[in-house]
Structures are given as C-alpha cells and as structure tokens.
Amino acid sequence: MCDYDGAMTIAEKTGNHREPRRVTAAMVAAHAGVSTATVSLVANGKSSGRVSAKNEQRVREAIRELGYIVDSIGSSLAKGVSSLVVLVAPDISNPFFAKVIAGVRSVLASDYQLMLSVTDAGVSPSASETRKILGLRPAGLLVHAPSQEFLEEIGGNLPMVVLDAPGISAKFPAVNMDVAQGARDVVAHFAAQGHTRAAYLDAITGTETLAVRREAFLQAAGDFGIEVLPSSVASSMIDVTAASAAFSEHWPSWKKAGVTALGCATDNHAFGVLHAARTLQIRIPQQLAVAGFDDLPYSATSNPAITSVQLNAQEGGRLAALKLRSLLEGKSPEPLQSMLPSSLVVRGSTVIDGDR
C-alpha cells in the first residue's frame, strides 16, 4: 500500500535490508521533536522566516540521520496538484537554451521543479515522446518551436506555453522572437556595405522559427536588390562541423557566382563557415561578409567576432514562465502572445575594424 506523505521508500537503517521501510515525515518529526508541518517547510525549502534556526537544524540532522527523501511526485498525486513543469527543448548544449532555462527558473523555481525533455538538435518536439512525459502528470509544459501537428495532438491536454514558434496557431499562449525583423536587419546591413549578391546557409530542421528566418532573408534580399540565386541557398545540421563541410562544398560555385555576403541560420553555422574559411584561405570580411543568428556568447570572441542577430533568450524564458504561472493559477495570460524585439550586433565578420 502506498501513502503519499512526502517520503520515498528506502532500506532501514537497522541493517535489516530484507524489509525496506518508508521513512516518513512523521518519523522525522518525532526524531527531531517538531511537527510534521515544520518538517515539510524545511524539506521543501520554505522554512525562511517560518522556522527557528534551532528547529531547522534539528530537522536537517534528523533528515540526514534517517535518510528521508521528499517524494514530490507522490505528494503531488495525493494532493491532485503537480509541482512539475516540463520544458521541451532541442539540444541544451546550445548556450541559447541555458539562458531560456535561467529565465524560466527565475519565475517558477520557488514553487515548481523544472524537468527538461531534450529533442535532437534542431528537431521539432515529438508528440509521441511528449505523451510519455504526460504520464508523470506535470502541472504544465513549456515547448520550444513545436509544429502545428504537435499542438493539435498535445495542446488540449494540460496548460502549455509555446516559445519561439512564429506563424504557429494563435490560440496558444506564446512568446516569440522577432526573427523576421532580425533577418531583414542582416540584409539591410549587407546592402549598406554595398553587397549585391548573397547566399544563405540554412538549418536542416522542421522548426518554424528557422523557416521564418530563411524566408524573411530571401524576401528582404529582393526588396534591397540583393540577388540570391536558388543555387546559393544551402543547408546543414545545426553543427559546426556539418556547417563547415556544407560551406566548403558550395563555396566554389558561390564564389564563381559573385557571392560576397552570407547569412547563416544560426551562429553555430557561422562558426563552421569561419572554420572552413581559414582552411580555404578566404578573408573574412574582405572576400566574404558572414552574419549569424542568436548572438551566442562565443560570437563576440571568435576571430573575427561574428555579426549576429541578438535574441533575448532569458527574457523569453521569463515571460513564458509568467504566462504558464497565470494558466496554472486559472487565469488567462495577458497578453496571450508576446513578441520580443531582436537587434543586430555588428562585428568584424561583416565590416573591417574602423569602418563600423
């Protein structure tokens, strides 16, 4: 029989491992000489200003001696209220997502546990994989760059907020980045530098945000009179090595076509281009101007530093968490959808130092 009073089963400290026993909050309370409510406050990190230092120390010593572990999921099931929030995101080795997570935690960490569900880099979240997580009965979901199909399958099951999915159904609470304006700013910058032929290195992915970046770049190129031939659009995985290989393959034809500027779907693509350019002895930016997206931390310290579209990932995470908190409290987020502005940070990969 399983009672959810906030404890997990462990082996007894008596040495009799044949009969595991549940260490409960009541046992900790008796050991420390305090109430179970006091144990709950200390164990859940809510004792500040509510429990005396002496009692807190006694509870912590009892927890350590007895091996008490809070069973958050069990407690949530018993109360009918979950304390688990799941963030579904691509490859978290990308520093962009570290900033998103920091923003989410700044809002939810005091009351919720954040669980990460990681998809393959640049791949839209899978509804079938996410359904497995729903078995944990989370309070809500934060989903980065889902497809419309994902929203149709998962969207009605529990509170959910979408991040960075421009163009996706407007009925879901969302926080988007103005990536279209960012792409236009890149093209405007190229035009101001006198470039008339450009190429674009896209990401092999089904995510809407990257499709919007590409289409906005191509549209703006036409508006500014910059030619982008169909053969001047290539793609690779969001990976430095893959991007380097893709650029190396296409550069001979791009050079022959007179390409002098290259837009990249992400800064990871731009890193790959710079790596290949050194091998191929291409001078950046004298022979080829290169701009990226996301303004990752290393973009400012690469050689040359990368011109990039800056997206406020931490603020995006914070706003998404605020919208989810509103949903969890039974309120409608205001506004339902938010758009964060982007900004172009100009560096040495597109202009020679002193010409900015």
Feature map (PLM): residue ranges:
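N-terminal helix-turn-helix DNA-binding module of bacterial transcription factors
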Residues: 1-80
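Alpha-helical recognition/docking segments in bacterial nutrient-uptake
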Residues: 1-20, 83-188, 192, 252, ...
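Short beta-strand segments enriched in small/hydrophobic residues
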Residues: 36-41, 77-91, 197-204
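Conserved hydrophobic residues forming the short capping helix/wall of the S-adenosyl-L-methionine
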Residues: 63, 108, 220-221, 251, ...
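Hinge/beta->alpha junction and helix N-cap segments in small-molecule ligand-binding domains
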Residues: 72, 90-99, 117-125, 175-185, ...
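Periplasmic-binding protein-like
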Residues: 133, 137-145, 197-201, 233, ...
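Flexible loop/turn connectors
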Residues: 228, 249-356
